[in-house]
Amino acid sequence: MLDHAAEMKSAAKAGRDGPKPLAGKSVAMIFEKPSTRTRVSFEVGISQLGGTPLMMSAQDMQIGRGESIEDTARVLSRYVDVITIRCFSHDMLLTLAEHATVPVVNALTERSHPCQIMADLQTMIERHGPLDGQIVTWIGDGNNVAASWIEAAARFNFQLRIACPEGYAPPAELTAWARAEGADLVMYDTASEAATGSQTLVTDVW
């Protein structure tokens, strides 16, 4: 996926027409939680791939007036080709995906933010080359974005260092899972220690 994204970005920068896998397709964007960067990047990306983004806030939908997420999933699946959702509850995402008959993309929940991490990984490759052996440091609360970094560390060959305020570490079961999957995960007590020698620093609330 990252290689394909790099090829498409390179073609766009060179002024060449890239593939349009979303040509003639509509993508619903349910944003229960407001956003600037996520919304703009999704809308622009969908348009560049030939699709039509349909922005939908909870206030604009029947879901804001009591319609179940199950019914919303079924109805939207009849109209659109893809559903993206940015919501407060991960369970809402899972329920939507279970009852939809079209692909569902996680644009953020309280547990994870995978699309942001994929974009960050692409930036790391552009700046520093292959991910193998790179060192990334997360400085901040062990929140949803940190969780997605931990999941990425279990899938790619880079070292992830984490420095969190006391009492705000990522869930122990998540870090245990990642290490069992082969993640090179190191916890630090201070941000300065964690940052030393890193190629990439990612910061959040402290």
PLM-predicted stretches and their roles:
Residues 1-40, 44, 112:
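Positively charged, low-complexity intrinsically disordered leader regions
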Residues 19, 73-74, 81-152:
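Anion-binding alpha/beta catalytic cores of soluble intermediary-metabolism enzymes, centered on
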Residues 32-44, 127-204:
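Glycine-rich phosphate/diphosphate-binding loop of Rossmann-like nucleotide-binding domains
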Residues 49, 99-100, 156, 181:
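Short, structured coil segments at secondary-structure junctions
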Residues 59-60, 108-112, 165-168:
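Short, acidic/turn-prone active-site loops that include or flank metal/cofactor-
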